[in-house]
Structure formats: C-alpha cells, structure tokens
Amino acid sequence: METPAPMVIRCGTLLDGLGRSERNAAVSMAGGRITDVRPWAEVSRQPGIRVVDAGRLTVLPGLFDCHDHLAAPPRSLLERSGTPPSLHVLRVAETMRGMLQTGFTTVRDAGGLDLGLKLAVEEGLLAGPRVLISLAIITQTAGLADATNAVGFSTEVLRLPGAPDGVCDGVDQARLMTRRLIRAGADFIKIATTGGVSSRVSGVLTREFSLDEVQAVVAEARAFGRPVAAHAYGGEGLKNALRAGVSSVEHLGPLDDEDIEMMVRQGTYLVPTLLNLQVRLEMAQEPGALPAYSMEKAEELAPLQQAAFTRAHRAGVRIAAGTDSRGLRPGGNARELSLLVKYGMSPMEAIRAATSTAAGCCHLADTGSIEPGKRADLIAVDGDPLDEIDVLADATRIALVVRAGRTFRNTIGGEAGGQG
C-alpha cells in the first residue's frame, strides 16, 4: 500500500487517551504516524498537506474491542449450518467494515477468525479494523469450546474453516496445541480455564484444565513472545490462570480477595465483557434465541458482576474494554463503554479502558493514545463523550475515522481555515 499522505486535524476538543483533555488543538500526521500535537493557533499551513476541520467535534484515539468473536455473528446453529462458507466469510468482512466505520480501529479476536481476514486488512483488501487473532480457544475435552455434543455431532459455530480446533488434554497436548496455533499465525493464545455461559456440560465456575496444563500453555506462549488470555469466570480455574501468569482475564464473575490481589500485583488485565451478558438478557425476549441453560447462567451471573467490578475497579485492577459481542449492529460495541460507566467508571476512565489501557492489554505500545510517534488511529465524534458517553455508540455521530493515517470515514467535509 502507498504511504498515507500528511494530514492535520483541527480538534474542537482533544481527548488524548491518557486522561487529558485539550481545547482547540491540532494533530499532525505523516506516514501513518502522529508527528505533532499542538494548539491550533500555532499551526502554519504547509503546501500539499490536507487539513480536516473537526473544530466542532471531539477527537480521541481509535477505539479498541479487546474481546470479540468476529466469525460468530448472532445467527442460529441451523442457519449457520446451511450457510456456504464463502457467504459466511463475506458476512464477517461486512461486520469488520461496520466496526471500523463506527470508530473501532483495533480488535482482538478471541477465537474463530483466521489469518486470511487479518492479512486482508493489512494488505488493504478489506477496510476493517487492525486485528489480533488467537485462531481457536484452547479447551479440554468437554470444556468450554469443545463443540462435539453427546452423540458426536459438531455444533461448531465459532470458527472459520481456516482456524484450527483447540481441543486438547494433558501437558504434552497443551504444549503442542500452543505451538500449532502459533505456527498458524496466532498473535496471542486464548485458553479456557473455567466453563462459561455458553458451556453445555460445565458450569460457569467449573475448573477446566489442571494448573500444570495451564502453566505449560503459558510457558510455551512466552517462549514465542505471545501473551495468554484466559477465559475465567472465577473459582479455582481463575486462580490457576493467575498462578500460571496469564496476561489477561476475560469475563467477570465472583472475585475474592486473593483473585484481586494477584491481578493487582501481577499487573493482569481484566476484560469484563459486560455487554455479553447484557445482550444475552435482551435476547431472552426472543423465543429460542438462546438455549435455556445459557439464559439461566446469564441470569445468575449478572447480579454478581456489579459487586465484582466495583471491587476490582477500586483496588486498581487494570480494566480494558472488550465486548464478546459477536457482530452487533453498527455502533453496538461501544455500548461496553456505557456499561463501564454504569458500573462505576468515570467517562474518562471508560475511554482510557477502550484506548490506552486496551493498547496495553493488546501489547500494542505504539497505539492507544494521541502522542507524537504513535500510530495515527483517531476518530472524531459529534458530541462530548465526557458528558454523554452514549454518543460513542451512535453510529450516526461518528464523523471521522482514521486508521494508521488513512481516512476510512469522513462526513465532515471542507478544510479548516484561519491558520496562522
């Protein structure tokens, strides 16, 4: 792809992703990187440099979704089983386009997406968010992501055909599976150490894998420089994940003092995926939308999340935004930020959770904030998310989307004038 042309964005309000707010700033970029941030009054017009006037808008870093399953949109097993793979891939690509159009410039896919769509974005064939992939969820037999039912029929709806099956048992198989996923292109490793809301066999807090198995996965991933994300709602499975040294904990269930102390001490990221339960509870109004066992678990777990979130937040656990939303309507992923605020974060904290803190969770040190040297991932929104966080979930109010210095959405029109 050609190198992005230089550009300057005039900002009504600039939120840098690190907790700072500045009025009437200007952000300059070239070669896909931010080169300068200064007051608009100090900017001099340079020939050949495009200027975008977002002087009435709020500019902030591109948003992250640290936990999604882009290959598993909310369609029934029956419908998915009758869908040609090529059509399914095109639907996934459309979901990715929609996410970028609504301000999400980076997504960490926690199982299902294959290497092809990631490369399509990198090569410019698909206008989607930057993607980090785990390919599959490492799971034990009869565990969270074992899609084989009691009669041997696969109910797999998560993975694209190019993503491996992550079922394995024992230390040696766990180590081998980690290596296979890395060989297949995984940016990070995802392991399930407890059951989940969608588990057919296990409960939400059922321990999955032994400590030795989890340690084998983490050690092997570290040898290849890959972080490990653990699906872990609580109990002994969560403790095993933390003892093994995972980089992040996905989802949120009951937390005790030991869990929180380990997360704070080790710097473990928590990706609570509050929206996942919210969406499931909303789907309860649609007959047959979800299995009864899944709805029962969601209803039991939902009231526990508020207390757990409050304790983790107050203790200083690093919380990153992720939805586990599986292809919501455009703008829907940003509802996670509204829930973070509802559960106790300030709007600025929620924005950091979806920008700079999320970048840390994704191990992308050169993204997530608006500073010289960082990747030029920015969005502009019509409104003030510090006053009304829900504005980020309104697709019609996302006026500008820039990823790596390239403009993928611009409803502003016109250039800024009045430069010195």
Placement of each model-derived feature along the sequence:
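Histidine/acidic-residue-rich catalytic or RNA/ligand-binding cores of hydrolases
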Residues: 74-77, 145, 199-200, 238-244, ...
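His/Asp/Glu-enriched, well-ordered alpha-helical/loop segment
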Residues: 83, 223, 288-293, 299-384
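C-terminal cap of metal-dependent C-N hydrolases
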Residues: 12-15, 354-356, 372-417
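Active-site gating loops and adjacent loop-to-helix segments of metal-dependent hydrolytic enzymes
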Residues: 71-90, 94-100, 141-163, 197-211, ...
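Histidine-rich, glycine-flanked metal-binding segment
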Residues: 1-8, 14-60, 414
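Histidine/acidic residue-rich metal-binding segments in metalloenzymes
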Residues: 173-270, 286-287, 298-318
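Divalent metal-dependent hydrolysis catalytic cores, especially in the metallo-beta-lactamase
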Residues: 91-117, 128-137, 163, 186-199, ...
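Metal-associated gating/positioning segment near the N- to mid-region
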Residues: 57-123, 141-148, 212, 236, ...
